[in-house]
């Protein structure tokens, strides 16, 4: 791999991401909220996504695509299905070396009076779904660079006037997000795609992609997600658990 050429492509991709704006949507690589973000948040999140992608665009064996960026995960790290505690070495299964190959940085403010929980302020945000996905992939024998995590809508959709909330992306937003997934696939080349949740699966299949649908881990779906991923990897010969 020509590192500098590939990094240039990655940075161009991130610039495209940063150009996206939509009402009630937070763009981790372009937007800044002084109530929650440190001053250099946008730059940190861009650099962390670039590091994450450069380790995987030629090494990933599968692509796992969920629905949208969550406020406890990628909203603050810039990386899909990856929370701050993972890149701060505050997580029981995942550490910064596995995600980035180096020490990560938080972008949430330790001193923010708007972040409600003390553990979130002192240790960073934690997202249960992120833990399930990472743990399932690692337990199946995949290395950290063997799977690339993404969201069909890569930004954080939130309720009006409620920054730390979540909502389902609209159909229009999902179609907007599909463009960025297709741009990502130009970087990686063809990969087996696993769609996490119905919105991701329907958007991808509607665009003509062949995907393996997996139950979303949220709302009691963690076991079905783990079993579905394991069984599919066994069938394709990628399981090494």
State where each predicted segment sits.
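Alpha-helix/helix-capping structural signal
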Residues: 198-199
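A polyanion-binding, active-site-adjacent surface
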Residues: 2-192, 202-207
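Short, flexible loop segments at boundaries between secondary-structure elements
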Residues: 208-240
